[in-house]
């Protein structure tokens, strides 16, 4: 599979292939909020000076946000960088259990260290968007969790996750999408980190704020673990522009909470609307989701539909073949503004009238 199908958000490369501008494409392949916040005015010093290697102000802002000590936080060049260091610890700890279907970056990170892993098959049929019990995992030394799960949108209850900390030598929990879920913080494992040495929680500001190009994420774990990661990594993994933007976004707790409420209300409203619209298409089943993307299933390949939307309507949906356990009969749709969601539904209706699935 070529690289543009392993991850969403490849507007530039797809635009080149289609002979259009990136701005001509409606990208529903990446699950980002459809707006961006007001960003700080860049000063010459931000560009000229070396960034703070300890990320002190950003760590303090994150610590205040989560109510934990600064020592439990480490900023990173997106969540992907932090998965790489978590995978190094995982490879040293033994066999990893990866959720399937799941985000391919976990296995990519383990591959950097020749870390062994097996799949933990999740159910491909579920109901509702409320917190659910995490399916009982097999035996291994390391458990990787994504909450809410990508790509299914299932939200796991903290009550079902907490006992797993006693079963595994290391638990790595990806909570990149959790801030977009109404009351999602109630299911977060971050409050458990201070008293739990074998837990790593990784988050990203990319999805919540729509700043994928800046690459800004953070890990919450015991200080000894994070100090090791800091010694292994490059000297300046987070650039000054990303740090300044992060401090602007998180510097005011009240402003951050307003943003979260706005984003959560949008995800709930547009998710319900899209569910209703997609459910009437014969041959397509939209799966329940707690977050800002919907997984859709059909009894036959959806690749022709995806390609038609791309070629004829300049709409990008997520090819799910990169998710282990899914195939051509699955697509993922990142929620957009109501106007753009209508555009997606209208284009799908037109293409499905030409080539029905049922």
Where are these predicted regions, by residue range?
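Conserved PLP-anchoring active-site segment centered on the Schiff-base-forming lysine
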Residues: 89-111, 116-123
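N-terminal "arm"/small-domain region of PLP-dependent enzymes with the aminotransferase-like
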Residues: 1-54, 61-64, 139
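PLP-dependent enzyme catalytic core of the Aspartate aminotransferase-like
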Residues: 159, 311-312, 322-358
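Conserved beta-loop-alpha segment that forms the PLP phosphate-binding cup at the N-terminus of a helix
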Residues: 56, 70-94, 217
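Active-site phosphate-binding strand-loop segment of PLP-dependent enzymes
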Residues: 122-183, 295
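Short, conserved charged micro-motifs
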Residues: 37-38, 301-307, 339-343
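PLP-dependent aminotransferase class I/II
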Residues: 198-280, 284-287
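Conserved PLP-binding catalytic core of the aspartate aminotransferase-like
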Residues: 267-268, 278-313, 335
């Amino acid at each position: 599979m070529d690289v543009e199908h392993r991850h969403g958000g490849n507007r530039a490369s797809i635009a080149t292939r289609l002979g259009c501008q990136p701005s001509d494409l409606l990208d529903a392949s990446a699950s980002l909020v459809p707006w961006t916040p007001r960003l700080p005015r860049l000063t010459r010093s931000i560009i000229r000076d070396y960034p703070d290697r300890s990320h002190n102000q950003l760590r303090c802002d994150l610590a205040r946000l989560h109510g934990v000590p600064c020592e439990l936080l480490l900023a990173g060049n997106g969540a992907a960088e932090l998965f790489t260091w978590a995978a190094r610890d995982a490879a040293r700890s033994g066999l990893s259990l990866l959720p399937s279907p799941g985000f391919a970056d976990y296995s990519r990170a383990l591959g950097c260290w020749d870390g062994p892993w097996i799949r933990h098959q999740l159910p491909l049929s579920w109901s509702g968007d409320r917190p659910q019990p995490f399916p009982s995992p097999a035996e291994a030394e390391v458990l990787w969790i994504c909450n809410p799960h990508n790509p299914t949108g299932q939200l796991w209850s903290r009550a079902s996750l907490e006992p797993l900390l006693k079963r595994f030598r290391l638990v790595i929990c990806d909570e990149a999408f959790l801030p977009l879920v109404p009351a999602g913080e109630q299911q977060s494992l971050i409050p458990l980190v201070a008293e739990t040495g074998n837990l790593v929680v990784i988050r990203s500001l990319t999805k919540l704020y729509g700043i994928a190009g800046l690459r800004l994420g953070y890990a919450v774990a015991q200080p000894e673990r994070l100090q090791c990661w800091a010694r292994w990594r490059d000297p300046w993994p987070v650039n000054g522009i990303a740090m300044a933007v992060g401090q602007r976004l998180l510097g005011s707790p009240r402003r951050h909470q307003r943003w979260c409420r706005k984003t959560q209300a949008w995800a709930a409203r547009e998710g319900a609307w899209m569910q209703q619209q997609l459910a009437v298409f014969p041959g397509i089943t939209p799966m329940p989701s707690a977050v800002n993307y919907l997984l859709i299933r059909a009894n036959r390949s959806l690749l022709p539909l995806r390609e038609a939307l791309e070629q004829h309507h300049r709409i990008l949906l997520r090819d799910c073949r990169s998710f282990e356990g899914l195939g051509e009969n699955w697509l993922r749709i990142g929620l957009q503004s109501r106007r753009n969601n209508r555009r997606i539904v209208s284009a799908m209706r037109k293409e499905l009238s030409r080539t029905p699935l049922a």
